[in-house]
Amino acid sequence: IEKKVLDMSLAGIFTAIIIAMSVVPFLGYIPLGFMNATIIHVPVIIGAIILGPKYGAYLGLVFGVTSLVKATITPGVTSFVFSPFVTIGGYSGNMWSAVIAIVPRVCIGIVAYYVYKLIMKVAHGIKGSQTVALWVAGIAGGMTNTLLVMNGIYIFFGQSYAAASNKAVEHIYDVILGIILGFGIPEAIVAGILTTAITKV
């Protein structure tokens, strides 16, 4: 019972951190023109590793819902891909917007947790294995977010996303790849570093 209460308390703290990061300007979301860079996946990853995959999925859900709410309340030019309630320049969100905003974020903690556990099992007893496991889990969680979100945008909103961001439709996947390489990989590396540094403390 004590562990359950502790886990619920920690989940509450992580929830508060995620909400605060989503609300405070430049803390969780960094505006980059037609996209936002984010580090909100970091508390989702850390929470999943500490509390397990169910709590990881819950924290990812919180992240996803805050993403949808932010896209609705303070929309940017491509916010329709994250909110079914937004219309920007004739381009509207739909149910797939909610899927893109929420499902990848739910997957972040689940993937990070199982990657961490797998590495710890395979590298059991090897010096430094926990550091490696935390770092790789952080990267895996970050890349899960980026790959699922950006490919979801391409599949469900390719044409309207291209038009809203002033890109040619035939080159839109090049733009998606550019975002994955230019923002997704650095975000994932930062997630790996922060996950390792914070969780080991």
Map each language-model feature to its residues:
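Loop-helix junctions at membrane interfaces
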Residues: I1-V201
